[in-house]
Structure formats: C-alpha cells, structure tokens
C-alpha cells in the first residue's frame, strides 16, 4: 500500500528540495538512477520476438521528464548499452542532461526509427505537468512499439495521461502503413497516450497511478538530496500532506501475478530501494475470538433477490457465509433457493421478523417496486451500517425522498455502484445543481464528490476500485480483469456486508477497553478495502488453473473467498 498525492503536493515537495540542492540537477540525477535500475531489469528479461537489436530508445521531451530520461540514458550507455535519444521538444531540451548523455556515448537521432531496432523504449516526454495527447505521427510510432510487444517504461506518468485524474486524451485517426489508401482498414483510430508496461515514479504515487491501466506495473523509488540532512521526497510529501489536512489517499494492488517484472527480474534483490504497490493492511482478523459465538462475531442481514432474480440472493448470501463464521440472515422471497444452497443461513421473508443484525445489505436483484423502496427507507432509519447495491442504487436515483433520507442519515452507509449506476445517480444530482465529476474521467474526484454529498462511503467498482469517505480515499487495482462476470457485484456486496458486520460488532466492544474512545464511521469504513481486496484475490484464484488463467464465474469467486481471506495479510486490531 502506497500513499497517493496530487500534482500540487508533488510540486510543493519538490520545490523544497530544489532549494536545498547542492547541484541544480541533484534530484533529477537521483530519479534517473532509479529509472536506469528499472530499465536494466527490463532489458534483462525475455526479448521481444520482433526485436533484432539490444538498443534502447529515449523519447525526450523539453522539461524535467526529458532530463530524467537523458540522465538515465547516460547511465545505461555507461553500462554498455546502445542508447538513442529522439528529441521531441521542438528545439527545447534539458541542456546539462543532454551534454552528460552525449559525453557517455549516448546517440541523438532525428528521424522516427523502425520499431524493430529497440529492446526497450523509455517515455520521457510529458511528465506530471503535461497536457493533451500525442501527435498522430508520434502516436503511430508508439503504437508500432506496443503492437510489436516492445516494452515501454514511463517516467513518472505515461505521456498523455492526466496525472491528477487518470483521464486519457481522445484517440487520433492515422493512416496505417501497409494498406492501400482506399482499403477499409487503412484509417484507424489509435490511442493518443502511451500505454506503459511499467511506470517508475518517485517519493509517492500520483493519483493517475491509482486508477489508470495505462500506467501498467507501477514502481516507486524514493529520491533524496545530500543537503538539508539528506532530505527525501517521501518525507517532504508527508509534511505537505500534513500541512494541507486533506483526506489521506492510498493505493494498493490486490492480486500479484508471478509473471510481473518485480518477480521475473528479481528487482527487489537488485534494487531494494524500488518498491511495487502491495497490500499491507492493518485490519480485523476474520477468525473468531475465544469469547465469540455465532451472534457476537457480527451478524449480516442480506435483503436481496426476487422471483425474477433469485440467483442474486444466493450469490450475495453465499459470499457472506464464506466470509464470516458468524450468523448470516437472509430476508426476501428467494429463501427456499437460499436455504437449499446454504442450509446454515437463517431466512425469513420480512424485515420485521429478521432478528438482531449488525449490518445490512440491500439491493442485489431485489426489484424497484414500492415494497423495496419501503424496505430501503426502513433500513436508512436504523442505526446499523447499511450497504446499498444494485437495484437499491436505482431506487436512490428514482426517489428524491430516499436521497434526502440518505443525506439525513447519521449511521454508516456504503454505496457500491459500478460506473453506469454511478452516472445515473450523478445525473440526478447534477440536475439539482450538485457538481459531480464524471466517473470515467476522474474516478477519485467522482467518488469523493458523491461521498461528500451523502456523507457516506462510496465504493466505485471496476478493475481499479475507488473507495472514498470524508477523510480518506483508497484505490485498489485488482491485478486482473476476471471480476468482469455476471454476479461478481452480488458476491462483493455480501462479502463487504460480512466485514461491515464484524467491524461494527468488534468496534462496539472497544469502549469496554478504552472508555474514552469515540467511534467514528471511518473506523468501520477502513475495513472495506480489505474486503474488496479479498474479492479481487478470490477472482484471481477462481480463474487460475494448472495451465494458466481461464474464465471464471461468480459462484466460483464466492467459493474462493476462504482461500483469498487466508492469502491476504490480516492482523487483529482488537
């Protein structure tokens, strides 16, 4: 797990170090050294089939990012690699970095080269201050590398990717070589950004690293200067964040594949100062305590399913059963299906007869009628945590009264929309004058805005899941895309609901030991990220076979929750 910072915070921390540098390029050289270490690890791996040479190409922009690339290229040339630099700054270049690069044998080229000459491409074009996309000509060159499997290492942020939001520029139309001009596929739309295989950044993560697949595998190296007692960028960033008193942001990666650069090149051994994004949570242990029973461990109540969608109830309840040793209650018309599949569940048809519950889940496959709306209104009036998913999110979209009830609610609430559900709710709020960013352009800002509007926690689902509350943001890269299967959201709701119930039960025991402690909603919300991580790990395990990965299903994901729970690093805090 790594902290995430805005561009403004990065700039302010860097400026402090710039003022203390003994040499104008001291910090840049420190960054370039890390770039070179990663580049060496990448070229030591298997060579692309189309690459006939061992050369390295630098794409060099006019600013500091280009300077990083040139200094890194100099270090690589010093190691004996042939390095070419394509200067793309319209006559502007970091002069001292260029001079050092050339002094160590680095070459300058002026024409766009054929892709097969290179073993690795280093993107030093835009950096975190860049705006806009690549030109059609440059986009075509980059596409030729990507299409041929030649790896690209981006410095700081892949060029074209907005560092604060992860937003991508519109694609560009190009004429592809090898086709007649009037051929149907001669003109194609290609990305106007760089899709990196690896991104190396410094001091801490940028927001784009937390949400953009264009960054590829993200690695982070701390950089420092000799002056000021050896100050580091990470320390300055922590100071800036403390001064801002803004919500803390973190990013993590759930499922670590064995074929990653970090594993393949043994980068941890060769460059221990460079780190990947990991898990590392401090969370509640799911093992019952010695004084627990089926009630005290946290009972989750799941209100889901209908005559049309009984399977949604089964999947959500199954996930909860697999995630907790405590009792799971079911409320809804699909109780026969649920009990047949999961006889340990206590089922009823009505909230009035549900019994004691520590957290509620409402919505999966439940329906959009007046009965379901009344159920949701009833749950919003109760003190227990409520997770709102699927059909219940649509009920919020359709009912101004329910939205107002949510605003007035004083108990913990979690919304779990995918981007389509998010946008439907956001459209209603925008019509009321509320500013909500688009989820596909700025997922962090969008989730934060919705969480602020309803004073709740928002879990915006996707391969990159964003969890936002009033005082923190946590983005989780699943590490794969196997969650894109019907019913996986129902599984997530039951899994998170079980964690909420246990968290609510455990945290309410704290006053026994710490009578002066006042509990906040955030203490419960922080347990959502481990649940989402377990969900992603379970999908990875469910998709894994002895021969490799293959399509999986929501049922198999639910079955893999116990193994995923054991795999994720958990620590008891109570």
UniProtKB/Swiss-Prot annotation:
Q: List its EC numbers.
A: 4.2.1.136, 5.1.99.6
UniProt-recorded name of the protein: Bifunctional NAD(P)H-hydrate repair enzyme Nnr
**What does the note under cofactor report?**
Binds 1 potassium ion per subunit.
What reaction does this enzyme carry out catalytically? (6S)-NADHX + ADP = AMP + phosphate + NADH + H(+); (6S)-NADPHX + ADP = AMP + phosphate + NADPH + H(+); (6R)-NADHX = (6S)-NADHX; (6R)-NADPHX = (6S)-NADPHX
Q: Give start and end of each YjeF N-terminal domain.
A: 10-231
**What ranges does the record give for the region NADPHX 1, renumbered to this chain?**
64-68, 127-133
Query: What PANTHER family does the entry give?
Result: ATP-DEPENDENT (S)-NAD(P)H-HYDRATE DEHYDRATASE, ATP-DEPENDENT (S)-NAD(P)H-HYDRATE DEHYDRATASE FAMILY MEMBER
- Protein's organism: Corynebacterium glutamicum (strain ATCC 13032 / DSM 20300 / JCM 1318 / BCRC 11384 / CCUG 27702 / LMG 3730 / NBRC 12168 / NCIMB 10025 / NRRL B-2784 / 534)
């Amino acid at each position: 797990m790594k902290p995430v910072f805005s561009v403004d915070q990065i700039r302010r921390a860097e400026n402090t170090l710039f003022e203390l540098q003994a040499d104008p390029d001291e910090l840049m050289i420190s960054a370039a050294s890390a770039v070179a270490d990663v580049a060496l690890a990448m070229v030591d791996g298997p060579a692309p089939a189309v690459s006939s040479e061992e050369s390295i190409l630098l794409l060099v922009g006019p600013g500091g990012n280009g300077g990083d690339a040139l200094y890194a290229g100099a270090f690589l040339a010093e190691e004996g690699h042939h390095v070419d630099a394509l200067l793309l700054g319209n006559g502007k270049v970091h002069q001292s970095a260029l001079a050092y690069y050339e002094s160590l044998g680095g070459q300058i080229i002026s024409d766009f080269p054929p892709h097969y000459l290179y073993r690795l491409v280093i993107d030093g074009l835009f950096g975190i201050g860049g705006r806009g996309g690549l030109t059609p000509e440059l986009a075509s060159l980059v596409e030729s590398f990507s299409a041929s499997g030649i790896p690209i290492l981006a410095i700081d942020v892949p060029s074209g990717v907005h560092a604060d939001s992860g937003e991508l520029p519109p694609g560009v139309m190009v004429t592809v070589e090898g086709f007649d001009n009037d051929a149907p596929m001669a003109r194609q739309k290609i990305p106007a950004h760089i899709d990196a295989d690896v991104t190396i950044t410094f001091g801490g993560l940028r927001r784009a690293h937390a949400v953009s697949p264009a960054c590829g595998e993200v690695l982070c190296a701390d950089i420092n200067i000799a002056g000021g007692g050896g100050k580091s960028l990470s320390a300055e960033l922590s100071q800036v964040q403390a001064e801002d008193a803004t919500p803390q942001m973190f990013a993590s990666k759930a499922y670590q594949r064995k074929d990653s650069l970090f594993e393949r090149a043994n980068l941890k051994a060769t460059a221990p100062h460079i780190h990947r994004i990991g898990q590392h949570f401090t969370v509640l242990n799911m093992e019952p305590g010695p004084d627990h029973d089926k009630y005290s461990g946290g009972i989750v109540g799941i209100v889901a399913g209908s005559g049309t969608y009984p399977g949604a109830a089964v999947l959500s309840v199954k996930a909860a059963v697999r995630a907790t040793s405590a009792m799971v209650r079911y409320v809804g018309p699909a109780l026969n299906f649920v009990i047949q599949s999961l006889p340990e569940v206590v089922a009823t048809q009505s909230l009035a007869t549900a019994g004691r519950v520590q957290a509620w889940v409402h919505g999966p496959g439940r329906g959009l009628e007046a009965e379901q709306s009344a159920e949701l209104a009833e749950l919003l009036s109760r003190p227990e945590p409520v997770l709102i998913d699927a059909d219940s999110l649509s009920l919020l979209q359709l009912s101004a009264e329910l939205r107002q009830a949510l605003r007035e609610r004083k108990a913990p609430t979690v919304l779990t929309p995918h981007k389509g559900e998010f946008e439907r709710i956001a459209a209603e709020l925008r019509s009321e004058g509320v500013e909500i960013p688009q989820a596909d352009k700025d997922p962090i800002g969008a989730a934060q805005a919705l969480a602020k509007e309803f004073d709740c926690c928002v879990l915006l689902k996707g391969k990159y899941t964003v969890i936002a509350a009033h005082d923190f943001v946590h983005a989780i890269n699943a590490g794969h895309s196997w969650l894109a299967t019907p019913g996986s959201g129902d599984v997530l709701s039951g899994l998170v609901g079980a964690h909420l119930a246990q968290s609510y039960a455990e945290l309410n025991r704290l006053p026994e030991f710490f009578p002066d402690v006042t509990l906040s909603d955030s203490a419960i919300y922080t347990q959502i990220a481990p649940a989402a991580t377990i969900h992603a790990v379970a999908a990875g395990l469910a998709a894994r076979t002895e021969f490799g990965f293959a399509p999986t299903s929501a049922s198999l994901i639910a079955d893999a929750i116990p193994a995923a729970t054991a795999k994720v690093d958990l620590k008891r805090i109570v």
